[in-house]
């Protein structure tokens, strides 16, 4: 990947890179761009992904347990079989994201996440728990009926 300076800080750009099975657990990846990259079965557990971009990325089977995903761009990302348990997705953008077979969302905070109505309904069908960091109830954050 390449890197660039934006606003005085370095941002790594991994556009179109194959990052299957990589381990990013606990890393500070704030603002990193993973757009259009293949990042299947990667480990982002407890990573700081605030404002990162996964636009059109293949994240199938990746683990985001207890990750800070505030303001993350997941537009058109493939989250099939991803593990989001305990993640904080506050204000993330996920219009067009593929959530087929996304089942591991317990204790996830979805507050103010921009998503389609059908995505919200699918997530409400399996939502449970309370986010350990924010204390927000998963179903309430999804505005489930």
Where are these regions (language model features)?
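Tandem repeat scaffolds
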Residues: 1-145
């Amino acid at each position: 990947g390449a890197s660039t300076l934006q606003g005085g800080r370095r941002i790594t750009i991994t556009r179109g890179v194959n990052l299957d099975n990589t381990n990013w657990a606990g890393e500070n990846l704030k603002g990193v761009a993973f757009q259009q990259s293949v990042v299947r079965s990667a480990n982002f557990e407890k990573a700081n992904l605030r404002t990162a971009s996964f636009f059109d990325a293949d994240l199938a089977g990746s683990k985001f347990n207890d990750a800070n995903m505030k303001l993350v761009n997941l537009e058109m990302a493939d989250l099939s079989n991803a593990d989001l348990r305990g993640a904080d997705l506050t204000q993330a953008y996920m219009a067009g994201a593929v959530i087929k077979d996304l089942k591991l969302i317990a204790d996830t905070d979805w507050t103010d996440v921009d998503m389609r109505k059908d995505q919200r309904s699918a997530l409400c069908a399996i939502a449970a728990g309370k986010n350990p960091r924010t204390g927000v109830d998963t179903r309430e954050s999804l505005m489930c009926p």
